Amino acid sequence: MSNSTLTLAQMLIARRSLTPDDDGCQKMIMHRLAGLGFKSDSMTFGEVENLWTRKGSDAPLVCFAGHTDVVPTGPVTQWDSDPFTPVVRDGFLYGRGAADMKTSLAAFVTAIEEFIELHPDHKGSIALLITSDEEGPAVDGTVKVVEALQTRGEMIDYCIVGEPTCTNQLGDTIKNGRRGSLSGNLTVRGIQGHIAYPHLARNPIHTAAPAIAELAQTVWDNGNEYFPATTWHISNIHGGTGATNVIPGEINLLFNFRFSTASTVDSLKARVHEILDRHGLDYELIWELSGKPYLTPRGTLADAVSAAIREVTGIEPELSTTGGTSDGRFIADICQQVVEFGPRNATIHKINESVEVADVERLARIYRLTLENLLL
């Protein structure tokens, strides 16, 4: 299986699938699985290509999910080899997307192939959900596929997202949830004027400062068994004309919550508005929800992946909810058990992105054993 997985990973890396361009990756996967009896549904929204392909109609349905798009390479001259010409060097496979996440996609496919070859009469069903819009806006990708599946009543029992989750070695980390992300665009209005005549103006920086300080010091929640406490941080702040003798007419702040299941979107919004209102600010606040938190407590899926990891690596994986958002947040709407597991993430989005060649086969074997743990 290792040569097959490595070869497929190299074929995928060679495709210049910069968001939202899939560059033929999904067709390659679709054609490979067609011979196994998979029925495919290509869903295009705008410039984004998505693939939903499934074999079987019985429960439980095990889904592998991932993305074919990759981030820009950065200066190509800083790479030791062309980022879209996959190279094996010193025991590592180099190329853009090697870790995030074309090796996982290749491992999905070869794991499924070997599982079906070994167990043609397995119970349940197997599916893949793949998008070319995970690294970008993520508005025409997985979220749209999930909406389509909801419309036709198609639910997933177990989903493994192939994001690169491991830190020091393959098998050390499973992501069993992610924090939510809620952003705010806050404008506090004052009255512009000459700085020598402050009685004829109202400085929004001065009026907003106490409220900003309170927001920064607020304990939003204490987290829980799976999540750290919710955080609130300012990412951008701007006020003034650039002159030293003008009191600005308004101040603008961009802020972001990374929040746990101990808080809700509505509770966070309400507390922010309460603080701003109590300080008597004249303001406008526009909210943007990038994703709600999701959590899969230890259970059937986490145990199945953990057992497969132990068998292949001898490592007891840690369950973690750290890091940014992923497409798991969308899939959680139609699947009660979602986890993420993939290769090491030390080089993702970096120059000379790579994955250890030995991990390519081991990752495919972990995915195949997970299928055995769930469908036999």
From Swiss-Prot:
Reactions mediated catalytically: N-succinyl-(2S,6S)-2,6-diaminopimelate + H2O = (2S,6S)-2,6-diaminopimelate + succinate
Residues that, per the record, bind Zn(2+) 2: 100, 135, 349
Keywords: Amino-acid biosynthesis, Cobalt, Diaminopimelate biosynthesis, Hydrolase, Lysine biosynthesis, Metal-binding, Zinc
GO BP annotation list: diaminopimelate biosynthetic process; L-arginine biosynthetic process; lysine biosynthetic process via diaminopimelate
Name of the protein in its database record: Succinyl-diaminopimelate desuccinylase
Biological pathway: Amino-acid biosynthesis; L-lysine biosynthesis via DAP pathway; LL-2,6-diaminopimelate from (S)-tetrahydrodipicolinate (succinylase route): step 3/3
InterPro entries named in the record: Bact_exopeptidase_dim_dom (IPR036264), DapE_proteobac (IPR005941), Peptidase_M20 (IPR002933), Peptidase_M20_dimer (IPR011650), Peptidase_M20A (IPR050072)
GO molecular function: acetylornithine deacetylase activity; cobalt ion binding; succinyl-diaminopimelate desuccinylase activity; zinc ion binding
Cofactor note: Binds 2 Zn(2+) or Co(2+) ions per subunit.
Residue intervals passing through the bilayer: none
Functional description taken from the UniProt entry: Catalyzes the hydrolysis of N-succinyl-L,L-diaminopimelic acid (SDAP), forming succinate and LL-2,6-diaminopimelate (DAP), an intermediate involved in the bacterial biosynthesis of lysine and meso-diaminopimelic acid, an essential component of bacterial cell walls.
Keyword hit for Transmembrane: no
Gene3D superfamilies assigned to the protein according to its UniProt record, in alphabetical order: Zn peptidases
Cofactor: Zn(2+); Co(2+)
Record bears the keyword Zinc: yes
Binding site residues for Zn(2+) 1: 67, 100, 163
EC number: 3.5.1.18
